[in-house]
Amino acid sequence: MVELSKNGFVCPKPIANKDNNYISDFNDKKFMIVSFLDGKSKSNLSPSECKIVGNQIARMHQITKNFKFTRNNDLSVRSWRGIFSQVKDKCNKIHAELPSLIEANLSSIEKEWPKNLPSGIIHADLFSDNIFFKNNKFSGFIDFYFSCNDFYAFEIAICFNALCFDGLKQNLSFNVTKAKKLMEGYNEVRKISKDEKVAIKVLSQGAALRFLLTRVFDYINTVDNAVVKIKDPEEYLKRLEFHKNAKSFEDYLI
């Protein structure tokens, strides 16, 4: 966030303490103070807003490609098998076929996952509640807790899942107009490569599985009187089905 701010990207700016550190301690806990970001999130983005978001994502990627530091993605494809092993025996309580659905998707994803695509620091959690607008103009991204090094195309795949599906969980449908506008905005700043286009299907399938698995884990391990609202894992079953049936990158745009 410090480096993004230095490069003119709009996000909360960390404020240094008296020792010129950004991370401080209070009662054995770490905390950071950041600048206030004007604006608020929208629950459902329009196609034109998706284009703006795509443009800003590409701007962010163009900035982060020059960063000298790295941060591992602790929720990358390498972690999903381990998460599944912790919920495999209980997730049928959520949906009877969930164990077999996860296993089938995970096996194919592990087999087809790309090994070498353009990469750098990504946000990795760009849901609509982390995207701010003010007076119908983009005003910044927030919540960089999950930011890490990964494929830039994986960020796009996450956004396809987070921003481009409409409807309730029983009848979710992929909004190709939103996806097309997202990519139009992105390609204005950074054109994705042929290899990234080829990989977008499995990356999107993987992004859906990643959020399904963490939601299943949270659902199973929630405690009584939990303050945080547990999100519905089943919202990702239709997403997985769509990605599994997609044939190519073009299926996301037409």
Regions found by a protein language model. Name each.
Residues 1-69:
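ATP-binding pocket architecture of kinase catalytic cores
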Residues 7, 11-15, 21-24, 81-85, ...:
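Structured catalytic core of nucleotide-sugar glycosyltransferases
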Residues 31-44, 85-89, 209-225:
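A glycine-centered beta->alpha junction motif in the catalytic cores
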